[in-house]
């Protein structure tokens, strides 16, 4: 049987890493098995759903390269793929469930259910008590005459609910632990409890991979599936796999309010898809005990949902950053230049370099950054409007001892014939290391800060070449003046 999995988020808020981890596991399993990845939108909550969030979901999947075989903007044999457009299908299933006696109309109010529990000495918060299961037609007619609007409830079986979870193994909910549950509101509108399994059934989903927070809903869905099979809506029940929770700081579940959970904040910092996907894959799965770094293609080749760990996974930002840095280093030079140029363009960063020079600058920082955003911190000295002396770096390097160093550097660089890295390096080494007999750190620290504004920069001689002769000399003079002024102030 061909594997068919689905990713069916609600379009609310911003995509978060736990949600996208679930999408990744579904997508990888489909690609590993040669199956279908179905993307479905659960937009039945008009008050919370938004078109902006829907578009953000499309953006997230496309940015990460998770293509879908069926769904919005792609179509497929089971269209439409937005629940808001499938209402008639759900109403037809409800009618068939009622006609077959698999479901019934329930008129009890929440207050009446609670009162019955109290009268029987039970906990009033136990939930629905199945009271309306066997109402006569006369009783139902009397409730309607009062103006009551019934909900439709499914008859739960009088037996334990057991299934073999692909991640957690055999799982059982004892008989009586799950009451008859509502499939509709009093208005007749179908609820998530109905539409999600019905869509899975109609779309012939074979495997449901989802977060463990949905584990308690599984007995209800198994019961509904059994009813759908009996009335001829489907001929099978999918296999379930409940993926581990993702924890944040302090081992609390990562919530939508945690900055780490916001997928687009990672993109904003400059994560690349390869790095983020690698890390998300590790939130519940591993390719090997002694290996953390792998490509998406390697993940697809190795991924089996049976290998997913049931223990909670903790989001570790430092580890995510380290993996992203490694994937940046693995990009070939031309691809890194393209990614960095796109990132700079998106964020309004402009080095003022032509394409060839920008490629040279990119090569200087590729192995020195964790996220693409770090590259701007290293290269913004090339943009006159963004250049500024870092106060801490200047305080350390542009002191009285820097005045003779920068004076000697200026004199040496004025005499450089061709403004190239090699000639710049030769001139400065002769003047500062041979001439002033300084150690490299003492010699080049003041020059680096004067020219780039910071003690942390790309390689110095290459930076001077990129900046150009005139601007380099101008900044060295300004740096010397800054150091001299500091001497005066100290005096």
UniProtKB/Swiss-Prot annotation:
Entry EC number(s): 6.1.1.17
InterPro entries: aa-tRNA-synth_I_cd-bd, aa-tRNA-synth_I_codon-bd_sub2, aa_tRNA-synth_I_cd-bd_sf, Glu-tRNA-ligase_bac/mito, Glu-tRNA-synth_I_codon-bd_sub1, Glu/Gln-tRNA-synth, Glu/Gln-tRNA-synth_Ib_cat-dom, Glu_tRNA_lig_a-bdl
Main subcellular location of this protein, as a coarse class: cytoplasm
Listed GO biological process terms: glutamyl-tRNA aminoacylation
Key words of the record: Aminoacyl-tRNA synthetase, ATP-binding, Cytoplasm, Ligase, Nucleotide-binding, Protein biosynthesis
Record function comment: Catalyzes the attachment of glutamate to tRNA(Glu) in a two-step reaction: glutamate is first activated by ATP to form Glu-AMP and then transferred to the acceptor end of tRNA(Glu).
Family of the protein in this entry: Belongs to the class-I aminoacyl-tRNA synthetase family. Glutamate--tRNA ligase type 1 subfamily.
Protein name: Glutamate--tRNA ligase
